[in-house]
Amino acid sequence: QIDLHNLYGGVVPELAARDHISRLVPLIKNEFEKNDLSFEILDAIAVSKGPGLRGPLLVGNTIANSIAYALKIPVINVHHMEAHLLMPLLDANPPSMPFVSLLVSGGHTLIVKVDEGGRYTIMGETKDDALGEAFDKTAKLLNLGYPGGPEIEKLAKLSQIDRFRFPRPMINSDCLNLSFSGLKTAVLYAVQKLDALSDEDKIDISNSFQNAAVD
């Protein structure tokens, strides 16, 4: 849905939900046909219950429950972030427990310890904005495309200097919590101070922002 949301510099929930409606069933059908599979092989259907955008979640849950009802199989409700946490276990060389995972998205930024038996400990989290949101908002300020992460990274590689030296909130704190709202505001002020936003400015701001965000 990148092309759909690019005009707005971020996800528009209503548009995302409508696009889910038009694409999800054909996508599922195509995947089964492409891999020569039958729906009868399914023993259950797992679906995300959230957290996330209400509209797209509703579409996914409606379709999952409809298919499950037709096949007379159970639906397994999955926590969105827990699913991300456990994805490494599907790798050919999965990590041994306990392991620590960094979850970064447009809505969440968490450092989580994963133990046996579905036990999780949040070691740190953002106290305000998610890192993905900060990247998207910065990209929008610089009139770049969506999603912001790849666009900023591409420009950052062209700069050799930390020209703007943006703040690193909480970097010296004793905890593992994070903060990105101040960084986002610092980028806004830097852009406002410039008479005009040149290509060189975009490159240097992207580099300075990315350096501060990942430090």
Label for each model-derived stretch:
Residues 44-46, 56, 99-103:
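Short glycine-aspartate micro-motif
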